């Protein structure tokens, strides 16, 4: 099994005065159907506690993710998951849709009475902050958003426990959505491929045409 993520990287933010850190990861960015989903877990850096068996969600079996989900929620100071639909991805573009999903999760954290001091975001690009725009053609979002400092780290989901835990929450919730949608459109095999562009998914798409849950603005065939 891979090396267990820790809170070592997160702990360095204590020296800058941060106590509550929000680890954030997304799931579904590369799918051709279904939502993009963002998970958040908040940890108290002044009282670091590790959580056994947590890994980046992609490295875990589905049964392990399901088992760990309630443990992650109990371990976190606060946690949340937000989604942006395929229609929103088509209308906004993927970066703004990620921001929309992340903002929805962020506002849930604030509504729970928790205000993180800093954010650790998986990847190299800050798609979460309201002022961040992918291009001149990507509209800046209206309304409230994440106003905490955002730090990005490539492969944070592999080494940082807060981000790996967030990836589990996002993956479990999105997979449940795709299994539910499979009941409406069983031909696409979403119970197995979770909306990703497998050969069988694309073959069904060519035969039946897109559903309302496909990202039709993408070159999905």
From Swiss-Prot:
GO terms, biological process: DNA replication, removal of RNA primer; mismatch repair
Keywords assigned: Cytoplasm, Endonuclease, Hydrolase, Manganese, Metal-binding, Nuclease
Reaction it catalyzes: Endonucleolytic cleavage to 5'-phosphomonoester
Residues annotated as binding a divalent metal cation: 25-26, 122
Recorded GO MF terms: manganese ion binding; RNA binding; RNA-DNA hybrid ribonuclease activity
Domain RNase H type-2: 19-221
Key word Chaperone present: no
Major localization listed first in the record, in broad terms: cytoplasm
GO cellular component: cytoplasm; ribonuclease H2 complex
Cofactor: binding comment: Manganese or magnesium. Binds 1 divalent metal ion per monomer in the absence of substrate. May bind a second metal ion after substrate binding.
Broadest EC class assigned to this enzyme: hydrolase
EC number: 3.1.26.4
Keyword Transcription regulation in annotation: no
Subcellular location: Cytoplasm
Cofactor(s), by name: Mn(2+); Mg(2+)
PROSITE patterns reported for this sequence: RNASE_H_2
NCBIfam families associated with the record: PRK00015.1-3
Family designation: Belongs to the RNase HII family.
PANTHER family hit by this protein: RIBONUCLEASE H2 SUBUNIT A, RIBONUCLEASE HII
Protein name, as recorded: Ribonuclease HII
Organism: Arthrobacter sp. (strain FB24)
């Amino acid at each position: 099994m891979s090396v267990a993520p820790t809170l070592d990287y997160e702990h360095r933010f204590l020296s800058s005065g941060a106590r509550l850190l929000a680890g954030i990861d997304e799931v579904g960015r590369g799918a051709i159907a279904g939502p993009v989903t963002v998970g958040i877990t908040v940890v108290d850096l002044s009282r670091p506690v590790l959580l056994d068996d947590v890994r980046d969600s992609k490295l875990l079996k589905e049964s392990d993710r399901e088992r760990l989900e309630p443990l992650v929620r109990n371990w976190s100071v606060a946690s949340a998951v937000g989604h942006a639909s395929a229609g929103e991805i088509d209308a906004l573009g993927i970066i703004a849709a990620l921001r929309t999903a992340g903002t929805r999760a962020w506002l849930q954290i604030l509504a729970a009475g928790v205000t993180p001091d800093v954010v650790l975001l998986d990847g190299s690009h800050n798609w979460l902050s309201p002022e961040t725009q992918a291009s001149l053609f990507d509209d800046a979002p209206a309304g409230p958003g994440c106003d905490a400092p955002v730090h990005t780290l490539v492969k944070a989901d592999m080494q940082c426990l807060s981000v790996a835990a967030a990836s589990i929450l996002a993956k479990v919730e999105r997979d449940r959505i795709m299994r539910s949608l499979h009941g409406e459109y069983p031909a696409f095999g979403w119970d197995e491929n979770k909306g990703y562009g497998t050969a069988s998914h694309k073959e069904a798409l060519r035969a039946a045409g897109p559903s309302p849950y496909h990202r039709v603005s993408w070159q999905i065939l």
